[in-house]
Amino acid sequence: MSFPQLGYQYIRPLYPSDRQSVGVTRSGTELSPAGTLSNVLSSVYGAPYAAAAAAQAYGAFLPYSAELPIFPQLGSQYDMKDSPGVQHAAFSHPHPAFYPYGQYQFGDPSRPKNATRESTSTLKAWLNEHRKNPYPTKGEKIMLAIITKMTLTQVSTWFANARRRLKKENKMTWAPRSRTDEEGNAYGSDHEEDKHEDEEEIDLENIDTEDIESKEDLDDPDTDIHSDSKTDTRSDSEVSDGFEDLNVPEDRLLKSVVGQRQLLNEEPQDKCALSSDAKVPQPACEQIKLNRLPPSPPQENNMPVAHKPKIWSLAETATTPDNPRNSPNTGGSVNTQNLIAQHRLIASPGSRFQGWTGRAFSAQQLSLLNSAHFLQGLGVSHTAPCSGNASFPKAAESKCSTNSLTDRPSTVDIEKTIPVLNTAFQPVQRRSQNHLDAAMILSALSSS
């Protein structure tokens, strides 16, 4: 027997070609003396089984016994009833005409069928009778499923599709979720199904506009509250600070200075001096900056001194003293140190002083430590070694720090002789005011 599809060549048969189908004794007498059957069966089975098979002369009914060890999976080992030429084990077996589907057979009357016109006619009749409340209860669904031979899932899906179709065609004759409390408690799953249907309609088809409008109406109070809070915060900021729209750092600095002066000095002549209509001769840079400032709102005239600080007004919070009337002597130095910390004036005058010189005195192009005419009336001796700050910052820093340590008593005396200032950065109008500002800055640098 050969297996050309498997790549094996012809194998010599164990029996002669003129074998008869019933020649049991002949085949046994022919194969037994030669020992061929015993050798084959000993390779397949053990020695006792091979001897028993040879004794019973079953060799004629085992045609492929030599090939069984090679292909044990091709078929059963004993082909006792059929002749070898009828069907081989490697051939395909006939299959049944159909396979059973699920737990029901095709002829079973209890098998659920698809929705047809006959089955849906019952559902349509029930829907027409209950147009005002097209939500069947669980018992009604079971009854309709038995009548139409459909499952509960099919019945529920059909009613959901029917309600959605009627909503789409604007033929709704019922109020959504119109069930009573008793039915709702008994059949809570139906309400969940209705909510799921409404969510699908809103998300997928955007049909149920009434639910959307009701949700928007429910959301309106929250939005009104948020909008009111936004307008309130904006109005408070506009009343307290009229310069929130200024983006230039110099303008913000001037805004903080003006606010501090208005808090500490409740006198109209200071505001007149800071207004854009003032006739007092002023430097060009200060005139330009004061022209940019809008007129202060009238609410600030009666503003109390100890008002509540705002979170968004950091400069005002930093420059406002705790009790300006009780401590007039320390107010100027505290404000000076706070403003210096706010505007990055740190105790290293050599390396970090260049960034400050371009803020309040950019139009005059003055370097506070390099201009001799600015400090000529003070008689301070430690400004001369610090003339090379821009080119050699580290060396100048070390020299200036040693000089400031040695000259600390002189700066303290200067601070005592200077009258108390409201802020460290007032608009400069006279030369003497410039001397006072420079002295305050140098004293703050040396003391820190």
UniProtKB/Swiss-Prot annotation:
GO terms for cellular component: axon; cytoplasm; nucleus. The keyword Cell membrane does not apply. Residues 108-170 bind DNA. GO terms for biological process: brain development; cell development; dorsal/ventral pattern formation; kidney development; maintenance of kidney identity; mesoderm development; metanephros development; negative regulation of neuron differentiation. Its main location: nucleus. It comes from Xenopus laevis. This is Iroquois-class homeodomain protein irx-3. PANTHER family: IROQUOIS-CLASS HOMEODOMAIN PROTEIN IRX (PTHR11211), IROQUOIS-CLASS HOMEODOMAIN PROTEIN IRX-3 (PTHR11211:SF14). Belongs to the TALE/IRO homeobox family. Acts partially redundantly with other irx members in neural patterning. Required for formation of the posterior forebrain, midbrain, hindbrain, and to a lesser extent, spinal cord. Both up-regulates and down-regulates gene expression during neural development. Acts early in neural plate development to induce proneural gene expression and specify a neural precursor state. Also up-regulates repressors that prevent neuronal differentiation. One of its GO terms (molecular function) is DNA-binding transcription factor activity, RNA polymerase II-specific. Residues 195-222, 238-247 have a biased composition (Acidic residues).
